[in-house]
UniProtKB/Swiss-Prot annotation:
Coiled coil: none annotated. Residues 221-239 have a biased composition (Basic and acidic residues). This is Small ribosomal subunit protein uS3. Part of the 30S ribosomal subunit. Forms a tight complex with proteins S10 and S14.
Amino acid sequence: MGQKIHPTGFRLAVSRNWASRWYASNTQFAGMLKEDIEVREFLKKKLKNASVGRVVIERPAKNARITIYSSRPGVVIGKKGEDIELLKAELQRRMGVPVHVNIEEIRKPEVDAQLIADSITQQLERRIMFRRAMKRAMQNAMRLGAQGIKIMSSGRLNGIEIARTEWYREGRVPLHTLRADIDYGFSEAETTYGIIGVKVWVYKGDHLGRNDAPVVEEPQEERRKRPGRPEGRRREGEGRPGGQRRGAGAGGRRSGGADAKTGE
């Protein structure tokens, strides 16, 4: 179940929140959902070089609030805020309501799944070896605090004729645990051989409730040793070479060396 399903959809209302937060009647829902998809596609193309991790859309009372999470907020804002004003005007034209745009900085882009996937696809488009790109991204994520990461690439890797899938994992990635904070990202690289898909799962720890305490493993040195047997008692066969029993010599004969049957 957890291996196949989308990690974010699996954890909605448990440890993850929706990317679109608004309410609509049955007649308006489809139109507003289509509008959200078009806005996200527009922002993805417009801010391709701004390292945008995710976009949150809210619609409070005939208004729209769009929050853009980016590791390069200066590229989104532009010189003296010119780019952000042009972006706001274009979004208002598309949505037909007043739009407020907020920019949030992603302080650790190395552990953001979407940014990792985008970085790998950009390297694949520049003809960098996919194994090198994947392993470098995993090392950076683990170095900056991720508890586990899994990266999967699918397609005509290195230009081979038959498409295949390769994945690497480091650390723990518990996809079945609902309280686990799993960040998921997907991106596509448009190469001369075709499209290569990249999926990234990043495990950042667990979401604990108010009454939950984190599980801390006891260091191995401080673990109690199991109580042993009293001194002076030992099992039969202990302390003899090869675990031989009492009275058994080489070849299983008795200490006298004579064969019991032949009497030799």
